[in-house]
């Protein structure tokens, strides 16, 4: 179990919310107070709610669910891509295409096209085309890679969405809600927490705050994955052991 400390949260600036004039009243339960026109998030609640979110993501990963990390704002792009890759999951960090979840079959066609273009470059098939055609295909691949590269290996809709700034990613959150996909999110003082299943109250604008919370969610995925692998291995060993016992029972004793 990865713990998050008050010291880590303070050092990363997770407690700084938005200006008091830019807030969503629904976030009032998560606000400690205001200082110099800025809302201060109640970090005691952040710690408690973070633990709930961490446990949920760990359990989901242990059950074999995939997690899609979403954060397309500039401050989140690097953390989202790097942490999702570190824990072997998927990400969207450039632009959310409408229907990415609700019309995944169509998006999958574009992913398959990207994979074909990758294969053409890898095996040299692209060399059979003219220079002009090669340039056109390379541009097409670059465009697809930018928007779909993070979900290239995702064969079906994810089991969980982890979102940085649900206000900015409202289409992604809306699609997840329609499909019944649980959403874990870093929710700042200007956000509506109603559509978020696991709210992590925190600063969703500071790079350090985003990195800290995103890396902890990646840790949760890794922890759940390790527990799943250990359980599967134990199950396989027990099955093998049982089969061995059956063989022994069926072998007649020597005279």
From Swiss-Prot:
Transmembrane segments: none annotated. Residues 231-255 are annotated as: Disordered. InterPro entries: Ribosomal_uS2 (IPR001865), Ribosomal_uS2_bac/mit/plastid (IPR005706), Ribosomal_uS2_CS (IPR018130), Ribosomal_uS2_flav_dom_sf (IPR023591). GO terms for molecular function: structural constituent of ribosome. Keywords: Ribonucleoprotein, Ribosomal protein. Residues 236-255 have a biased composition (Acidic residues). One of its GO terms (cellular component) is cytosolic small ribosomal subunit. Pfam families: Ribosomal_S2. Gene3D superfamilies: Glucose-6-phosphate isomerase like protein, domain 1 (3.40.50.10490), Helix hairpin bin (1.10.287.610). GO terms for biological process: translation. It comes from the Bacteria. Belongs to the universal ribosomal protein uS2 family. NCBIfam families: rpsB_bact (TIGR01011). This is Small ribosomal subunit protein uS2. It comes from Citrifermentans bemidjiense (strain ATCC BAA-1014 / DSM 16622 / JCM 12645 / Bem) (Geobacter bemidjiensis). The gene is rpsB.
